[in-house]
């Protein structure tokens, strides 16, 4: 039986899963790592810690699966996107901690570029907005704030990459500096229509081309691992950013199909086939690129989903474990007019307000822990409604089904409430960790284990479906309360700036 090792490097943990050819997980390992918050709005990771943890999890997953490295036909990598690493080509050491996608330190830089009239140029080339979420201003910040970094970069001594590139560099011991089109499309430096790094954008963000990785298909030859790392030289043949990998893992291969992943953040992606320009502040991005052909997608990004539950646990100590949230929500049924707007690092799509900060509204003397926790879960659903409404407006048709995945959707109350708030059917697959599965599928395509996307689609199975059970007037009433709460948060942020 051939096996594929899938590396799933996320925002809060590094995971490795061994899959067989039928998409069944045979063994896995996962480890959380430290988050750094040196200043307000700053979020950093230790890239070397990520690499060491990832390697250890790969080794542990193989042991747990009782699979030898020689039995692996390929490795797939999926990763937190936009997070920016700058390292020394000679030593392989990072010059500074990685700047995470959630980091907002370059908000003023983005505002200045918008004020100078560059947003339309950037959007037309990249499909993205001028927002600190993306890699370009993070990279420019590192070049300008790490001593001698810009001079060394221009001399060809430094390499930039998102986490996939960083892991690939380490896995191949510096032999391969590459990324795939999905990760490149999240940097603000990549022209998604011409499928290349864009010289005008490099000039705009003051980034030297010498630091950039080679861009390849999502299923391609990305080199071979150094044998001593896993016990054998294994080809790396699939790479995709986490949300695009989930699109593949959910087998959303037809235009109009939508998936939403619920982890640290929430990310909804619709396969559009061709590029669709959003008029509702969604992102036009690369869904995947296979055999040189690009399939495009619309994406809405929510910065805080599961992270709100982590905050309730670690910041407020209202719960000890995320699994407690379902019982608490069932006890009260709803948040009872309490709204948590989790804008801890700004608001993502479709609001895109980097200055917004979190708020808890509608509190009364009767409000208790259960209502606050339930408001945290409901916020995930309301933000998802924001995204689905925007996608429907852009595409002229509203999807009737949403395929969901990620750690949060094992919560049946959340999945049902999601269906109630959105007014569409919600399908949860047998394999909810579809991000890792998508990376495995891409690696399998790259090595010839799968003949086509159609053969992958045949493996998708629904574990449970949820249908709307909330009356339309109540659905609209609750959602309007959310819209009012967000409007107040945005109004406050404008007043503060």
UniProtKB/Swiss-Prot annotation:
One of its GO terms (cellular component) is cytosol. Pathway: Polyol metabolism; glycerol degradation via glycerol kinase pathway; sn-glycerol 3-phosphate from glycerol: step 1/1. The keyword RNA-binding does not apply. Its EC number is 2.7.1.30. PROSITE patterns: FGGY_KINASES_1. CDD domains: FGGY_EcGK_like (cd07786). It catalyses: glycerol + ATP = sn-glycerol 3-phosphate + ADP + H(+). One of its GO terms (molecular function) is glycerol kinase activity. One of its GO terms (biological process) is glycerol catabolic process. It comes from the Bacteria. Sn-glycerol 3-phosphate binds at residues 11, 81-82, 133, 242. Inhibited by fructose 1,6-bisphosphate (FBP). ADP binds at residues 11, 15, 264, 306, 407, 411. Glycerol binds at residues 81-82, 133, 242-243. ATP binds at residues 11-13, 264, 306, 310, 407. Keywords: ATP-binding, Glycerol metabolism, Kinase, Nucleotide-binding, Transferase. Pfam families: FGGY_C, FGGY_N. Key enzyme in the regulation of glycerol uptake and metabolism. Catalyzes the phosphorylation of glycerol to yield sn-glycerol 3-phosphate. Belongs to the FGGY kinase family. HAMAP family: Glycerol_kin. This is Glycerol kinase.
């Amino acid at each position: 039986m051939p096996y594929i090792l899938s590396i799933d490097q996320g925002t809060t943990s590094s995971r490795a899963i061994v899959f067989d050819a039928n998409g069944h997980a045979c063994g896995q390992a996962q480890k959380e790592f430290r988050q750094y918050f040196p200043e307000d709005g700053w979020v950093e990771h230790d890239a070397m810690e990520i690499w060491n943890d990832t390697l250890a999890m790969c080794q542990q997953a193989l042991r747990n699966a009782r699979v030898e490295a020689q039995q692996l036909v390929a490795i797939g990598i999926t990763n937190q996107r936009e997070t920016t690493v700058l390292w020394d080509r000679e030593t392989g050491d990072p010059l500074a901690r990685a700047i995470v996608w959630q980091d907002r330190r370059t908000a003023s830089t983005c505002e200045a570029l918008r004020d100078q009239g560059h947003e339309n140029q950037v959007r037309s080339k990249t499909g993205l907005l001028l927002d600190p979420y993306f890699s370009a201003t993070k990279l420019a910040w590192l070049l300008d704030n790490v001593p001698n970094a810009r001079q060394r970069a221009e001399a060809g001594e430094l390499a930039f990459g998102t986490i996939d590139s960083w892991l690939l560099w380490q896995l191949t011991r510096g032999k391969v500096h590459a990324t795939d089109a999905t990760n490149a499309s999240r940097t603000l430096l990549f022209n998604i229509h011409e499928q290349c790094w864009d010289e005008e954008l490099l000039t705009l963000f003051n980034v030297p081309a010498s630091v950039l990785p080679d861009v390849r298909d999502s299923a391609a030859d990305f080199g071979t691992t150094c044998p001593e790392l896993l016990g054998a030289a294994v080809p790396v043949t699939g790479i995709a950013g986490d949300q695009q990998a989930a699109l593949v893992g959910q087998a959303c291969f037809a235009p109009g199909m939508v998936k939403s992943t619920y982890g640290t953040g929430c990310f909804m992606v619709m396969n559009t086939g061709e590029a669709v320009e959003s008029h509702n502040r969604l992102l036009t991005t690369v869904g995947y690129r296979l055999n040189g052909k690009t399939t495009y997608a619309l994406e809405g990004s929510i910065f805080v989903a599961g992270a709100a539950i982590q905050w309730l646990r670690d910041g407020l100590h209202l719960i000890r474990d995320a699994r407690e949230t379902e019982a608490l929500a069932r006890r009260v049924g709803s948040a009872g007019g309490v709204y948590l707007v989790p804008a801890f690092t700004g608001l993502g799509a479709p609001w895109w307000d980097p200055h917004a900060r979190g708020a808890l509204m509608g509190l009364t003397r009767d409000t208790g822990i259960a209502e606050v926790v339930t408001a945290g879960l409901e916020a995930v659903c309301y933000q998802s409604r924001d995204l689905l409404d925007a996608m429907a407006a852009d595409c002229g048709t509203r999807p009737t089904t949403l395929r969901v995945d990620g750690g949060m959707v094992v919560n049946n109350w959340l999945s049902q409430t999601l269906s109630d708030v959105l007014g569409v059917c919600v399908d949860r697959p047998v394999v909810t960790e579809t991000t890792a599965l998508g990376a495995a599928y891409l690696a399998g395509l790259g090595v010839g284990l799968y003949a086509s996307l159609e053969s992958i689609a045949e493996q998708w199975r629904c574990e449970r479906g949820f249908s709307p059970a909330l009356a339309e007037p109540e659905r609209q009433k609750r959602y309007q309360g959310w819209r009012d709460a967000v409007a107040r948060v945005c109004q406050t942020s404008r007043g503060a700036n």
